[in-house]
Amino acid sequence: MLFRWCPLVALAIASGTAATEQSWESSPYYPSPWTKGEGEWEAAYQKAVSFVSQLTLDEKVNLTTGVGWMQESCVGQVGSIPRLGFRSLCMQDGPLGIRFGTEARMDIFLYLTCNTNFYLPYVGDYVTAFPAGINVAATWSRELAYLRGKAMGEEFRGKGADVILGPAIGPIGRAPEGGRNWEGLGPDPVLAGKLVAETIKGMQKSGVIACAKHFIANEQERFRIAAEAQGYGFDIAESISSNVDDVTMHEIYLWPFADAVKAGVGSIMCSYNQINNSYGCGNSYTQNKLLKGELGFRGFIMSDWQAHHSGVGSAFAGLDMSMPGDTLFGTGVSYWGANLTIAVANGTIPEWRVDDMAVRIMAAYYKVGRDQVQVPINFNSWTTDVEGYQHALVKEGYGVVNQRVNVRDHHAQIARRVARDSTVLLKNKGVLPLTGTEQFTAIIGEDAGPNINGPNSCPDRGCDNGTLAMGWGSGTTNFPYLVTPDDAIQREIVGKGVGNVMSVLQNGDFKNIQAVAGQADVALVFINSDSGEGYISVDGNEGDRKNLTTWKGGDEMVKQVTSVCNNTVLVIHSSGPILAGQWHDNPNITAILWAGLPGQESGNALVDILYGKENPGGKSPFTWGRAAEDYGTTILREPNNGKGAPQHLFSEGIMFEYRHFDQKNITPVYEFGYGLSYTTFSYSDLRVRPMRANKYVPATGMTKPAPRLGHSSTKYADYLFPGGFKGVTKYVYPWLTSTDPKEASGDKNYGMPLEDYVPPNANNGDAQPVLPASGVPGGNPGLFEDLYEVSAVITNDGDRVGEEVPQLVRNLSFFPPILS
């Protein structure tokens, strides 16, 4: 695959052993690897060791444990270390920009907290609403991925956030109905890996820590959280298990994370789902062996919010930070906090494991230069009022919580460029670009116009009202404004002062639709398909899409227009592919554009393409099938294991999406990587040159023993709440309420024999064998050796400036062929 400003790189397609029916269990792997300093991590590691060496046990625990849901300004914060002047680290959503104000995992959060005292503001706080990750994938541009990441990083830094909860590379998009596919970078692991690496570099260049998520095999919303599924009427007690074979894990789901680690990502978020029947944040195989062992990840693993299911077990399994800190939202009870303090004091967890957690957190902090660019936290996730409660959950600490700092700078230009360059021209019978001087232009469809209640009126964008510019869920942000296609197109035409333009912005108003479209020289018809996170249901779509059809009767609206207008231009806003089979080859549809989820600059970016101000250069980041069955994969829609964890077998192995279409010889409507242009390109002088790649050498040897940075007291009395200290209600602290550890822990099972819950070798801090697949951050260096250089002379033969994205698909000869 080629990225616009880079040499050609080949995408290898290989067959692998598919998963088969069996009992799926995740193999244990202990101890949790301790980090070390090397390469670009060396200086940060040394600073981290120096800092952590000064800490008491309770201060180390404070670094690892969130203070509780809605207890501070950010969606997640750990404790502070006042003695050293170290403020609480701020974790903030999300992958499209700074999310706050509506903070609305409402369905599940209100259910769990019984808290109805939420204020739902509808305004943005001087931040940019960027295009979605799937749009970045459609640009195939490392440059734009970097620029978007850097702009985001600058905004988070300006608001005082330390960690961006993004970018997303899980879900990768195994099933086209997946609710959060749009947050990620598409279903090809090479494309996703290259672009996530540049996004991370941009974010961290700005002085904030990127958090790549969701690790791993997190491919659907349904059943991801048992309590959430219960709210939808499913009687299950455990989250879904994604059952994945090792080849598929490495070649598909782990690959983009390898690129993220190689790029120096500071944090990775573990996921809600189980992997081979072990929860993501307590899975020692995926966290200890794959991520910290094979990939050599030097940063810290953070739990998704309430994806933390155990205390001692998750610590041994590699989790480094618990978010938001409480076991259930608003309880003030934590698996860690005081319980982690007790577990170290009584010898259950060796102190070196907590040292390693703290060093990993601080190494990421120093690596991106957080100590050099500190900005006070100047926003609040729970209200956009200037004044409010610092501890919103319990309504304590009233004062100024929002300073309304404008952090946007020139970022609207970057957002517009990404939205524009990600627009994919799927069909053109010579009608595009338009001139703006057409005699009569009709604009048809709700998706062209505004949400009459405002673009932020639905919490976390949990509706499909007006034009679709982002999906829904925690990965959203508030729009500072939203330029609708209707506004931008009308402005373009009226500015020319020649043609008429008329809009009908109700999909079902067939009488007026036909009356207007029947007079038009060109009818611009807008359709969409939305999706999002599982805590919000929109029209029965509980995060994941129910189907791949258009929403709000879009197909029928297209039929109504094309029956009276022979020059219909179709514009699609969607979170993924839709079924285009019934209209893509309609002769009265003269052009089709996919604009994805373009963010705040939606209309402006579209006008740039429609009216030829810029050449369309986007390439489809997914395959467009003729039927849902063409994909060969879908989400699991019904429980299949009684009340236990639904079992989702990834039986296709690596053969999903375009690989499946190729293997099964299924002709799609539009291929992965497809996209037309207003100009033409010719290829010549194609050359393939073998590179002098180094021989693959498995890593060998032993690690050093686990660094021990402190010898803390084992006396429980040393960890009691400080005398005279007045705490915040339901706040998670590292201190004990009693010298009786069972009473202080609140754990009815306290005192169980260690052999009943501490896995063999988990507390072994001796030198350990180096994994053969390891070597440097990202994995064995042999993974990144260039085998061939492919070059060509590409000539623009047309009369317009444009960009081309050459693509090369190579079937490796030592695997069974999958292409005929």
Curated annotation (Swiss-Prot):
Catalyses which reaction(s): Hydrolysis of terminal, non-reducing beta-D-glucosyl residues with release of beta-D-glucose
Gene3D superfamilies associated with the record: Glycoside hydrolase family 3 C-terminal domain (3.40.50.1700), Glycoside hydrolase, family 3, N-terminal domain (3.20.20.300)
Active site: D304
GO terms assigned for molecular function: beta-glucosidase activity
KW Nucleotide-binding (keyword) present: no
InterPro entries: Cellulose_deg_GH3, Glyco_hydro_3_AS, Glyco_hydro_3_C, Glyco_hydro_3_C_sf, Glyco_hydro_3_N, Glyco_hydro_3_N_sf, Glycoside_hydrolase_SF
Entry EC number(s): 3.2.1.21
UniProt GO BP: cellulose catabolic process
Keyword hit for Secreted: yes
EC primary class: hydrolase
Source domain of life: Eukaryota
Family: Belongs to the glycosyl hydrolase 3 family.
Name this polypeptide is given: Probable beta-glucosidase ARB_05654
Species of origin: Arthroderma benhamiae (strain ATCC MYA-4681 / CBS 112371)
